Amino acid sequence: WYTVDGIFTRKSSSSRPRHLTNDDLSNHYTRGVSYKEIFPNKELGTNDNTTLPVLNLAFYPNERGPYNLDAENVNSDGTLGNPEKRWGGVMRKIEPSDLESANYEYIEFWLLDPYLEDETAEGGDLYFNLGEISEDILKDERKFFENGMPVDGDMSKVDTTVWGKVPRTQSTGYAFDAQNRELQDVGLNGLSTEEEQIFPTYADYLNKLRAKLSGETISKMMDDPFSPFNDPAGDNYHYFRGDDYDAKELDILSRYKRYNGTEGNSQESDQRYATAGKSTPDVEDINGDNTLNETEKYFEYKISLRPKDLQVGVNNIVDERTPEVTLMNGDKEKVKWYLFKIPIKDYEKRVCLLYTSPSPRD
């Protein structure tokens, strides 16, 4: 989940990698989207940005995500088995928290046709959960916050869980030690990549994974800095720019695959530009109230993203637009946008779950 940076959407950008052509910049899922494309009657001032900040959600169901230690359902080439059973999700704080009192009535958004490049795709489902969602991302009933990791090497200040290390201290705020940021910016498991290599949970995962893979796959993975053998937890961060990315001539989508990593996402840069994804520690405290919420109590809304269900009048779709857009390569193409408007009162399911603490392989 990300917003594509302007260096990839502005035609005049001097920072764009040279190998990216105008054809690359014309991909509908990474190109810039103008206000007029969706809101043709919107009046813009002379100093207004004419490009919409689009939320991009990319899901690769046959590729491993952070802290996924499933070594059983893996193919010999390293891809995940049963991709149709995989899921991906994001969560964030919503303000105000009391939507009813604030008179919010709908979940409303425009969605670009997901099947512009593959009309034969079967599609899937998109869920929205509004309410209390557990902040315990790595299920251990302990709140992790990166700035709680000791910088003096005193391991009496941490406890060990099945996932890694967690601070024993209570959090009073979230800010890195100014002089030792690299010792704390280790991701939500409290372990650096080097520590993951020898930590029992990840070492066991790697042993089981190695037995499932072909020799050719293992050889390729050893050369991949983001493979499980070089990043056991799968939590390492990489900015969407980098000399290594340029050398590999990565496309725009591939450049954002590691952008949500939590280990190393606040480091100072040795590049000629800033590369940090954020300046604050990663924490299991989405709403910033200094507590760990473990409750699952929410309203669930479901929409189908199957091609046959993308039509006005059903599936909470209330409008559609088919503008003709001029792409960076000069081509003109028609694309379709769907307007979803989901009444908050019309939830599909009300969920209230008791907390359980599964193993990292569940």
Where are these regions (language model features)?
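Long, low-complexity, polar/charged, intrinsically disordered or flexibly structured peripheral segments
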Residues: 1-84, 175-339
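Extracellular/lumenal carbohydrate-interaction signature centered on repeated Trp-anchored short motifs
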Residues: 96-103, 331-334
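Extended extracellular/luminal ectodomain segments enriched in beta-structured repeat modules
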Residues: 101-106, 121-123
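Extended, low-complexity, turn-rich repeat/linker tracts enriched in Gly/Pro/Ser/Thr and Asp/Glu
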Residues: 114-120
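Short edge-strand/loop segments of extracellular domains
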Residues: 130-138
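Outer-membrane beta-barrel and related beta-rich outer-membrane complex signature
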Residues: 138-144
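Short glycine/proline/serine/threonine-rich loop/turn segments at secondary-structure transition edges
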Residues: 349-354
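Conserved small/polar residues in nucleotide/adenosyl-binding loops
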Residues: 355-362
